[in-house]
From Swiss-Prot:
Belongs to the universal ribosomal protein uS8 family. One of the primary rRNA binding proteins, it binds directly to 16S rRNA central domain where it helps coordinate assembly of the platform of the 30S subunit. The gene is rpsH. Pfam families: Ribosomal_S8. This is Small ribosomal subunit protein uS8.
Amino acid sequence: MVMTDPIADFLTRIRNANLAKHEVLEVPASNIKKGIAEILKREGFVKNVEVIEDDKQGIIRVFLKYGQNGERVITNLKRISKPGLRVYSKREDVPKVLNGLGIAIISTSEGLLTDKEARQKNVGGEVIAYVW
């Protein structure tokens, strides 16, 4: 089966594992998936991220995070820019997710950044996803 949007597949796997309350998720690795996973870790949405090298492309192991009573830290993830309809944001129009409670992941000339980092560095780019 040919996968047309590996980023959407990655976000869907995280969403499904989160809804099923799994502790660990393994997905095939790519540079953009590694970047998204590192942003989720840095922003506190996941516990840890490990990249396991193998003879092929590698595997990303994501350790999901839950609250004291088992409530989900990630409420939802939404793919914004899709292969059929790319969504770009100028530096003045970088989106806020739920008035700053969530994050927007943006692919910029400076690499993958959150919406806050993009505003600080004064750059725009392709809006990859929203996480809240």
